[in-house]
Each structure stands twice: as structure tokens, then as C-alpha cells.
């Protein structure tokens, strides 16, 4: 066992001590440009696979540092967004900052940040031009109407009370928090590799998604720093996993 694995196990022990381990931000979604490219990459892949409309209702698992990826969905025309997380990383100031920058990116039909800016981000696309074909039958300008933007911004300020277009639920465990057969697209970005009860999570996603809806998950199978090799964690025993995780909500 190398030094990195030993440090992770010691971190697992510390997690049982109150205040021993702090839950750090997840990274990524604190950047509006990251959220913009992630949402439009998922939407582009969905479009190429037959989902050619703007989804009315979307749900994201593990939004992380901000709910910006789902906000990008709302700015592209979605009407309702469910954000589900197990640890509350986000805050009002961060969400509003990301939202305001997203408005500008959409208004300018900005190209998607590509592999040069985010070299590790998947899925990759053949073109990073703004996907105008997706919005050909939809008036993007209407989605960016000043009154709609202000309404969404007001909801972000009071996100835990309003819950009209945006529902942030943290922590979540019961699939019944979202009505069955009510979501057009369920998506996640580098999240499901952290989930322990994966069967429960997939059952929930299939419960929520409408007939004809889609589930879009980008899963990062790398070690996330648990080992020196990208796939070194594959060799860990169940005991090692348990020791590393400790009392943390996820690893």
C-alpha cells in the first residue's frame, strides 16, 4: 500500500472525529463557462440521438458548487429544474454570479469552451460552435426575455422558499420527492462514480423520467486521487474502501 492510500485511510479515520474532515467544494460548477459547456454538450449528444426538443423538465444529480448547469438548461428553454445533492456546497452569491454570466453567454450565442479550456471534460464534440440547430424551432430570445431573467434571478435569491422553476433538494434519498413520469431529461456529470447505492439511484432516475425522455450520465472512472494510477482504485479491497470512506457521505 503506497503513501497516498495510507493518507486516504487516515482521512477516513479522521472523519469520525467532529470537525476532523471538512467537505470541500467539488470544483467545476463554480465556473459559468464550465456549466455552459457541460449543459450544451449533454444537449448536443441528446439531439444527435433523437431528442430534438428543449426538455420542459430537467433533473440533475450532484450539481456541486453551484446549480449552474441546470440554470443553463433553464436559460435554453427548460421550465422546471430539480437539483438533487447529498451535501450542500452551493450558495446564493455563487449561483447568482454564475447565472449572470450564463445569461451573457447565451445572449451572445457563444461557442462552447472546448478541450483547450477544459481538457479533461467529457463528452467531447466534433464541433464546439454554438448549436444553433437545436434552437432552430425555438426562440432563444424569448427564453432570455428580461422579465423571465429577472423572475429566475429573484427565485435564486430566495431559492429555499419560492420553488417555482427551481427546486434544490439536499440531502435527498426518497425517489418520491419527484413525481413519477414527470422529467424529460435526468443528467449528471462525474457524479455516479461516487454513489454507493447505485441501484437505488438508477431506480429513482427511471421512476422520474417520462416515456420518451432521456437519462444522460457522464461517469468518470478515474481514481479521483485515490491512487497514483488512473485505475489503481480498481484493486482496492472492500475493507480498504470502507477505511478510506470512513464516516464521509461519499468518497
For each feature predicted by the language model, list its residue ranges.
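Membrane-proximal basic amphipathic "stem/tether" segments
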Residues: 1-27
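Conserved class I S-adenosyl-L-methionine
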Residues: 53-65, 95-98, 214-240
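Class I S-adenosyl-L-methionine-dependent methyltransferase module
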Residues: 75, 79-166
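A short acidic, Gly/Pro-enriched loop at the edge of an enzyme's catalytic core
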Residues: 173-186
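Hydrophobic beta-strand segment of the Class I
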Residues: 186-187, 216
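A short glycine-rich, Lys/Arg-flanked "PGG" loop and its adjoining helix->strand segment in the class I
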Residues: 199-214, 220
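Acceptor-substrate binding/catalytic loop of class I
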Residues: 239-251
Amino acid at each position: 500500500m503506497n503513501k497516498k492510500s495510507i493518507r486516504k485511510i487516515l482521512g477516513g479515520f479522521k472523519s469520525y472525529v467532529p470537525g476532523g474532515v471538512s467537505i470541500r467544494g467539488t470544483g467545476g460548477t463554480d465556473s459559468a463557462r464550465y456549466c455552459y459547456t457541460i449543459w450544451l454538450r449533454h444537449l448536443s449528444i441528446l439531439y444527435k440521438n433523437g431528442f430534438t426538443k428543449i426538455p420542459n423538465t430537467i433533473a440533475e444529480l450532484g450539481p456541486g458548487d453551484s446549480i449552474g448547469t441546470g440554470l443553463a438548461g433553464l436559460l435554453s428553454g427548460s421550465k422546471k429544474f430539480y437539483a438533487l445533492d447529498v451535501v450542500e456546497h452551493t450558495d446564493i452569491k455563487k449561483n447568482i454570479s454564475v447565472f449572470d454570466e450564463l445569461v451573457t453567454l447565451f445572449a451572445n450565442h457563444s461557442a462552447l469552451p472546448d478541450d483547450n479550456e477544459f481538457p479533461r471534460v467529457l463528452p467531447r464534440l466534433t464541433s464546439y460552435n454554438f448549436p444553433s440547430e437545436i434552437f432552430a424551432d425555438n426562440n432563444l430570445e424569448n427564453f432570455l426575455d428580461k422579465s423571465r431573467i429577472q423572475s429566475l434571478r429573484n427565485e435564486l435569491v430566495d431559492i429555499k422558499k419560492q420553488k417555482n422553476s427551481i427546486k434544490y433538494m439536499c440531502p435527498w434519498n426518497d425517489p418520491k420527492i419527484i413525481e413519477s413520469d414527470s422529467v424529460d431529461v435526468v443528467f449528471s456529470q462525474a457524479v455516479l462514480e461516487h454513489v454507493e447505492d447505485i441501484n437505488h439511484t438508477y431506480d429513482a432516475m427511471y421512476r422520474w423520467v417520462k416515456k420518451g425522455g432521456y437519462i444522460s450520465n457522464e461517469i468518470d472512472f478515474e481514481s479521483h486521487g485515490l491512487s497514483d494510477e488512473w485505475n489503481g482504485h480498481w484493486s482496492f479491497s472492500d475493507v480498504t474502501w470502507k477505511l478510506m470512506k470512513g464516516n464521509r457521505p461519499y468518497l
